[in-house]
Amino acid sequence: AKTTPPSVYPLAPGSAAQTNSMVTLGCLVKGYFPEPVTVTWNSGSLSSGVHTFPAVLQSDLYTLSSSVTVPSSPRPSETVTCNVAHPASSTKVDKKIVPRDCGCKPCICTVPEVSSVFIFPPKPKDVLTITLTPKVTCVVVDISKDDPEVQFSWFVDDVEVHTAQTQPREEQFNSTFRSVSELPIMHQDWLNGKEFKCRVNSAAFPAPIEKTISKTKGRPKAPQVYTIPPPKEQMAKDKVSLTCMITDFFPEDITVEWQWNGQPAENYKNTQPIMNTNGSYFVYSKLNVQKSNWEAGNTFTCSVLHEGLHNHHTEKSLSHSPGK
């Protein structure tokens, strides 16, 4: 995918919606590639009450939203600006968020919806492990306390299914609510590229909101896995780092875990998949261990799950050799 700058849209309630002492303003950053973008409010001077949601990848482009809750009086229209920066395209956009005034009292005017809907893919480990259940997740955020319940409908290749598990809505720290629906899916349905659609409806929405997701299209390519022992310069410290480099794989869905003498290890961190110039991806994983455990000759194993691999799994081990 080529570098694409974002489009930025202000999200503001109408004056009729500003009945309490606070008002939530939003900023939708849509259709950019690659990650990341940064969103600040009033060039960073406004940080309290800010909630920026994770980016979602659809059709090879990213979308995210950010909201800020501010006092509704005095009117914030002169002071609230959403600042968006996309370094990859050298794009900087400033959008002033102006609450709409419909000029009619006490009528209710049509306003942009502040609620946002996101759809998330199943975890790669769930898709590639036959004993686990992969799930596609649909999340609605920024639901007002006074809004009616939202209804979820799910479709697989445009055929409605009724097996989703919808949780009661949960109150968030900013006094809005979040509603989540999870659809258990068949492993092969995801791997074969079927399309999953979440339709969200509510009396508070002017129209249903639909989000779709499917596996990234393209021929799977198995990763190459390399393990790297701690550098000599680190051996003077109490803790050392073992590195696993996983490269040249496609699509980006991958699981990387570590074991220590066959038991799950926890003290590791993975990077997000990063695109190579040829369209494949690479990931680094770092496991921190006590130097004494490394020097004792314990075996540390980097375990990788990816659909391009034989049996979807491979692993590489490393251990300290005396005298090295």
UniProtKB/Swiss-Prot annotation:
Q: Which SMART domains match?
A: IGc1 (SM00407)
Molecular function GO terms recorded: antigen binding
Task: Please list where the region (CH1) is annotated.
Answer: 1-97
Say yes or no: keyword Disulfide bond present: yes
Has keyword Transmembrane helix?
no
Q: Which keywords label this protein?
A: Disulfide bond, Glycoprotein, Immunoglobulin domain, Secreted
Give me the glycosylation sites of this protein. Answer: 174
Q: PROSITE patterns, per this entry? A: IG_LIKE
Which cysteines does the record link by disulfide bonds? 27-82, 138-198, 244-302
Region named CH3 = 218-324
Tell me which GO cellular component terms the UniProt record holds.
Answer: cytoplasm; external side of plasma membrane; extracellular space; immunoglobulin complex, circulating
User: What biological-process GO terms show up in the record?
Assistant: antibacterial humoral response; antibody-dependent cellular cytotoxicity; B cell differentiation; complement activation, classical pathway; defense response to bacterium; humoral immune response mediated by circulating immunoglobulin; immunoglobulin mediated immune response; phagocytosis, engulfment
Q: Which PANTHER family match?
A: TAPASIN (PTHR23411)
Protein name (record): Ig gamma-1 chain C region secreted form
Q: Can you name the source organism?
A: Mus musculus (Mouse)
